[in-house]
From Swiss-Prot:
Listed HAMAP family: RecF (MF_00365)
Name used for this protein in its record: DNA replication and repair protein RecF
Organism: Francisella tularensis subsp. mediasiatica (strain FSC147)
Gene3D superfamilies cross-referenced by the UniProt entry: P-loop containing nucleotide triphosphate hydrolases, RecF/RecN/SMC, N-terminal domain
SUPFAM superfamilies: P-loop containing nucleoside triphosphate hydrolases
Family: Belongs to the RecF family.
Amino acid sequence: MYISNLRLQNFRNIHAKSFDFKNSINFIVGKNGSGKTSILESIYFLSHSRSFRSSQLNRIINHNADEFIIYTKAYNPDEITISLSRKKNSNNISKLNLEIQKNHTEITRNLPIQLINPESFNIINSGAQQRCKVLDWGAFYLDKTFLKIWQQTKFLVKQRNSALKQNYPYSYILSIDKKLCEFAEILDYKRQAYFTKLKPKIYEILSHFNPNLQLDIDYFRGWNLHKSLAQVLEESFNYDNKYKVTNHGPHKADIVLSVSHKPIQDIFSRGQQKLLICALKLAQGEIHNSENDNKCIYLIDDITSELDSIHTLTLFNYLKQLKSQVFITTTEKNKINEFIDTNSYILEI
């Protein structure tokens, strides 16, 4: 997949502009407030039907307008068009090849995105839910049945929590547990299948950044490895019932990062943590590209302020090997001069 043209109308501070891009590394250069990150945000929005910058979607619409429109022409390898519009206090309207979509799933499948921005580096210090999203992103593209299993599992956990809060009888909780255990086992299997591919790839890429970094990467499924979920839920019922929430299950899954059984945030410097996240994101893209004809697109926001020049060069070289389309923003052109080659494209705004 690569985007050849992007048109924005009333998207943040961009009133009406059209941008052409190359199927290579695209540098977007401009001062703060010029709209660089808004271009990345619009591409991300097309893929995910949401922003990575704000949950207040009405604020994305230009203050002089009532609606924003994002339109792109892309190749996968055949030409496709994707558009998304949103009016104030209304829902998103998504179109794939001019056909309105009932949900955004097919567009997300057609437009796989990996984002690296300053907030990405908080994955290590965030809760398990953020790290579990790494697994779910990969499993979604690896296995077309994953989404339905994930949705059903999420529904059952929510249903169980609601039943606990409303003091439903234990027999009713057990009826939910039976279904939850069935779907949780399948979800765990699919996550484990992706993690098995991801773990060695992270190690491989991280060695390019810093061969001296040592860490352990483990998958925690959300409950005791040596017990069935049914047994764990039964044993923890009194505790769950006391606090009115389900404390064990696939919603508690995590990627555990440690060094000699100590959390890496206690061992790794901030710079080393950033290298690990870059390796993680690159690993996800490489696995995706090897399993799909539809290559992953990278959105990288102001990376030169996050990594030193040596590690930035390592990142760029690896991105070139992936042969994915890449969008990189920067405030200063001189920061990227050493990374530009004949295949690069520079957009100054």
